[in-house]
Regions:
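Long, low-complexity, charge-biased intrinsically disordered regions
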Residues: 1-188
């Protein structure tokens, strides 16, 4: 597939200027399931209402940074990028000039990348595998709603954003610590 440079301004973020390379997912044929179970708005509203109507309940947001980018690919993909888009210092540092073919550098994608159609489902499967030993599971008939087996913690999950209802800071920290084992997280 091809590489595309995406520039974005996000004033709510610590670093509002955002530049990233995405893969042209429209050219990738992925033969397996691509849909990711995420919470819908009614599910989120129910958790919010439950928070305000449950004694001592609190609500927080958790964001996993670079969740897709840290996920190993089940099968590798390949991408080409014009060498003219790569800064000279990077070309020199990685000795890319001899690897250039017809003006392009060819790359093997071994971890998730924005634009790949399978990035979401792979990241979600890995998250599920990593949270299960800590007692977290997705409720069977409500996509994107997760609970803990015994602790008063539940959350909605949309991509890499958690809306967490909890009772007691210790219980909230249980989820944060479980996530911190494998991810860098931000909380609000």
């Amino acid at each position: 597939t091809y590489a595309q440079i995406v520039v974005d301004y996000r004033p709510q973020k610590t670093d509002p200027n955002h530049v990233r390379i995405t893969a042209g997912g429209n050219l990738i044929s992925y033969p397996f399931e691509l849909t990711t179970r995420t919470a819908d708005l009614p599910t989120s509203k129910i958790v919010w209402n439950s928070t305000i109507s449950t004694k001592n309940a609190r609500y927080m947001c958790i964001d996993i940074k670079n969740m897709y980018l840290a996920t190993p690919m089940e099968r590798h993909e390949y991408m080409r990028m014009p060498i003219s888009l790569i800064p000279n210092n990077i070309i020199q540092q990685y000795a890319l000039q001899p690897k250039c073919k017809n003006g392009y550098i060819y790359m093997e994608i071994i971890r998730g990348m924005y634009g790949l159609p399978q990035a979401g489902i792979l990241a979600n499967k890995l998250l599920r595998k990593r949270l299960e030993p800590h007692g977290y599971y997705e409720v069977p008939h409500t996509p994107g709603l997760w609970k803990h087996e015994t602790l008063p913690v539940q959350f909605t999950l949309v991509v890499d954003d958690f809306g967490v209802k909890y009772i007691g800071k210790t219980n909230a920290m249980h989820l944060i610590n479980a996530l911190n084992e494998n991810y860098e997280v931000e909380t609000d």
